[in-house]
Structure formats: structure tokens, C-alpha cells
Design a protein with these regions (language model features):
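Core segments of cupin and vicinal oxygen chelate
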Residues: 2-5, 11-50
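Vicinal oxygen chelate
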Residues: 7-15, 41-44, 57-143, ...
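Residue-level signal for secondary-structure boundary sites
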Residues: 51, 74-76, 111
Length: 143
């Protein structure tokens, strides 16, 4: 029986690719792209990516969200607000196109990237909190 292994990418609809890239660059600085065409851009996250697709036509949706893992939650949220995001609470914002983002710190979640991938992303030495390690340990995924 096959098993899901992870998420390769998430596709997010935005107004224009240029505007969306400017928005994310205001939050994260220069973003690395895997590729770009007229109506698509692919923001690299090491072994995953976010696909931006131009032409959003549906209204804002706060019921569903994208969980974005970062190495600095507080700074990410402050920069998102400064970039024009609408803040929902201490962890969540809505981008200018109505996409709901929940920001979580890498150190506090079970999701783990290999040391080699972290190194390739310029994040070597990024650590997990004791709580996250304990959660992984209960699943047999940490020593």
C-alpha cells in the first residue's frame, strides 16, 4: 500500500507574479527561484517550493491556510505586516491576494529537513526545541 511521504509544493494564486515576488522579498529579502514563466514563479525552499500562479479571481479565504515554516517567526510576522499583510492573530496573516498564511518556527515543529538540505539553504545549525524533539521521539523519529 503506498504512503504519502510529504508535500513537494503548494500552489498559491496571486494577482501578478511581479507584485507577489516583491511582497515576499519585502518579507524574506531576495528569494531564490526554481523557475519563472509569464504566469508562474517557483520560490525555492530547499527540497520543496511554493508555486505562485498569476490571476487569482476568487475572494479571500481565511478558512484554509498554508503553514509556512521559518527560522524567525516574530521577524517574519513583523515584516509581513510592514509589507502590507493583514494580521489575523499572533501567528497568521492574509497576503494582498487573500491567501491565509500561518507562520511557525522551525525549531518548534516536528517537520525536519536533513542537515545537508539545511546547509544548502544557508541554515546549517538550525536547531529543534526540546518540545519538538520530544514529539519526534514519541514517534520513534528522534534519539
Amino acid at each position: 500500500m503506498p504512503r504519502p511521504v510529504g508535500i513537494n509544493h503548494v500552489a498559491v494564486e496571486v494577482g501578478s507574479i511581479d507584485d507577489a515576488l516583491r511582497f515576499f522579498e519585502e518579507i524574506f529579502g531576495e528569494v531564490e527561484l526554481r523557475g519563472r514563466s509569464g504566469s508562474m514563479a517557483f520560490i525555492d525552499l530547499g527540497d520543496q517550493f511554493i508555486a505562485l500562479s498569476a490571476g487569482r479571481s476568487q475572494p479571500a479565504d481565511e478558512a484554509r491556510h498554508i503553514g509556512l515554516v521559518v527560522d524567525g517567526r516574530e521577524e517574519t510576522l513583523a515584516r509581513a505586516k510592514a509589507a502590507g499583510a493583514r494580521m489575523l492573530d499572533d501567528n497568521d496573516f492574509v497576503d494582498p491576494w487573500g491567501n491565509h498564511w500561518q507562520v511557525v518556527d522551525y525549531r518548534d515543529i516536528q517537520f525536519t529537513k536533513t542537515p545537508r538540505i539545511l546547509e544548502g539553504m544557508g541554515l546549517a545549525g538550525l536547531e529543534k526545541s526540546d518540545r519538538a524533539i520530544a514529539e519526534l521521539r514519541t514517534k520513534g523519529l528522534a534519539d
